[in-house]
Amino acid sequence: MKFYISATGIKKVTISNPGVGIGKGSGGCAAAAAALAARRFSSRTLLLLLLLLAIVLPFIFVRFAFLVLESASVCDSPLDCMGLRLFRGGDTSLKIGEELTRALVEETTDHQDVNGRGTKGSLESFDDLVKEMTLKRRDIRAFASVTKKMLLQMERKVQSAKHHELVYWHLASHGIPKSLHCLSLRLTEEYSVNAMARMRLPPPESVSRLTDPSFHHIVLLTDNVLAASVVISSTVQNAVNPEKFVFHIVTDKKTYTPMHAWFAINSASSPVVEVKGLHQYDWPQEVNFKVREMLDIHRLIWRRHYQNLKDSDFSFVEGTHEQSLQALNPSCLALLNHLRIYIPKLFPDLNKIVLLDDDVVVQSDLSSLWETDLNGKVVGAVVDSWCGDNCCPGRKYKDYFNFSHPLISSNLVQEDCAWLSGMNVFDLKAWRQTNITEAYSTWLRLSVRSGLQLWQPGALPPTLLAFKGLTQSLEPSWHVAGLGSRSVKSPQEILKSASVLHFSGPAKPWLEISNPEVRSLWYRYVNSSDIFVRKCKIMN
């Protein structure tokens, strides 16, 4: 090996290695160079490998740590998680979903309080859930348990809110609007100061029509002045021969004065109208006793129904909310609603009538009803609805009666449809030849003996029993009911073609809770030009 060193003043200095032979100089240098290159290559590779490991190992450690933490609730073991991540290249979202589903299904719901209205230890909001999971570092099973309790509590709150909203909606239907109260007061005052409001109804020249069988007699039992005016106005406006109609209004003593004043003042635009108060009837003592007994029994049934609902904290079986709450309406106890069973005694000189409720509006001529052949039956009524034969949602016999009692199950069929009240044709001559009124009283007494458990409160259930087998079915287009419900299910074409629209249900058209989609069908027959209607702001 030789080193050549150059310096100032020295041209060349040569240092020779004595251990290297002259003959081997070129071969020895090549071997030494190869060994030096091999040492340099191995050192560089080792340095790069160490640098790579220094970068990769921390990531592997962190990833493995996460897998170990997840394995407690997701994977069967850390190696399982590593197998999922490293060898399959996927994530654990599918297995997490399966584990979460299993935890939710297996989680018991034994967290209700003694009343079943709450969940112990349940959280109130999503933020509370996040804090709970973050601070306490819960596993997936704990997360499922807490989440399920929270959701159950929220579901109960929603159901409770819906239930209370339904109860309040029904309570709103019990009141009398300020505008109607105003109308009655102003008409009562008008009756006392205006001689025209006190004139005889009908006028003397028309009295003979009250019992003339050649005229079409319509009966209303009502204490609502505005509703009665709409019924008569809509009937007259849609009649081909309005002069053929005679209206008989029966009201209570309280409403007689404003009712008489309204039709006396508006007599020019009305056909023959008779207004009669219950205090003007002179019935035998026997009839008075039966009427009083009838009302007493209906009150007992109503009170028992109310007490049962109160004891159950006004909870309901699904699908029975409407019937249960509507049965609590004070109108179920109103005398005028129960007097229809005594119509033959109210009108002893009439043979055929049409009875209309005060919550109906007439859209076509009713004259052909008096020509309808009842085939020897007493009452003509719509049985099947527009939706088809034996289609009557919410008014099958099972919706009114307690079929667990043998008295009911032996006389009626659960799935049969009850006929609609509100627009009925009565053959009073045929009625007088039956014992319908007495059968009605008999069923009331049987109800008392059976513990008042035979039917829901109201006049219709015992009426259905008394008229069993004496009903003639009419075409469904004559009468469409249910417009006083929360949602009107009848199609628009059915509503337009119906002869009589019945706002049966709590949402009467004169109430604010009425359905705006059908309210206009009733309000178009309100006399908006009348001074009392304007002063009382009824159209507003």
Swiss-Prot record:
GO BP term, example: cell wall organization
Keyword RNA-binding carried by entry: no
Matches recorded under InterPro entries: GAUT, Glyco_trans_8, Nucleotide-diphossugar_trans
Disruption phenotype: No changes in the cell wall content.
EC code: 2.4.1.-
Gene Ontology cellular component list: Golgi membrane
Lumenal compartment segments: 69-540
Cytoplasmic side: 1-47
Cysteines paired by S-S bonds: none
Signal peptide: none
Transmembrane segments: 48-68
Glycosylation sites: N402, N435, N527
Pfam families: Glyco_transf_8
Function text: May be involved in pectin and/or xylans biosynthesis in cell walls.
Homology family: Belongs to the glycosyltransferase 8 family.
Name assigned to this protein: Probable galacturonosyltransferase 15
The organism of origin for this protein: Arabidopsis thaliana
Lineage, highest ranks first: Eukaryota, Viridiplantae, Streptophyta, Embryophyta, Tracheophyta
